[in-house]
């Protein structure tokens, strides 16, 4: 029996902090319907991700994938940079 390819969770978000060495904080936003009132509410989550080459800058839109735990709070890795932030 062949090994089944494992599905990897990926998310897309915006880099809000790149001050750490080889790490970035990514803000993931999603819209959820309120259970009682039915209005759509924006919810967000901040996730720490591993950036091996320190190539991300604040404001970049990136894709991250779930991986094994790399530290106490970091278990996501950078897959690719979708869009670079404009530098003024």
Swiss-Prot record:
Cysteine disulfide links = none
Q: Which Gene3D superfamilies match?
A: Nucleic acid-binding proteins
Q: Name one GO cellular component term.
A: cytosolic small ribosomal subunit
Q: Which InterPro entries match?
A: NA-bd_OB-fold (IPR012340), Ribosomal_uS17 (IPR000266), Ribosomal_uS17_bact/chlr (IPR019984), Ribosomal_uS17_CS (IPR019979)
SUPFAM superfamilies documented for this protein: Nucleic acid-binding proteins
What keywords sit in the KW lines? Ribonucleoprotein, Ribosomal protein, RNA-binding, rRNA-binding
What does the annotation say about its assembly with partners? Part of the 30S ribosomal subunit.
Name the record gives this protein: Small ribosomal subunit protein uS17
Gene this protein is translated from: rpsQ
An example Gene Ontology biological process: translation
Q: Name one GO molecular function term.
A: rRNA binding
């Amino acid at each position: 029996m062949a090994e089944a390819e494992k599905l990897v969770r990926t998310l897309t978000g915006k880099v809000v902090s790149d001050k750490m060495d080889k790490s970035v904080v990514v803000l993931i936003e999603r819209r959820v319907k309120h259970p009682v009132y039915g209005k759509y509410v924006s919810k967000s989550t901040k996730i720490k991700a591993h950036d091996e080459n320190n190539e991300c800058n604040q404001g970049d839109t990136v894709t991250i994938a779930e991986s094994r735990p790399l530290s106490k709070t970091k278990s996501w890795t950078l897959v690719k940079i979708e869009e670079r932030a404009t530098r003024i």
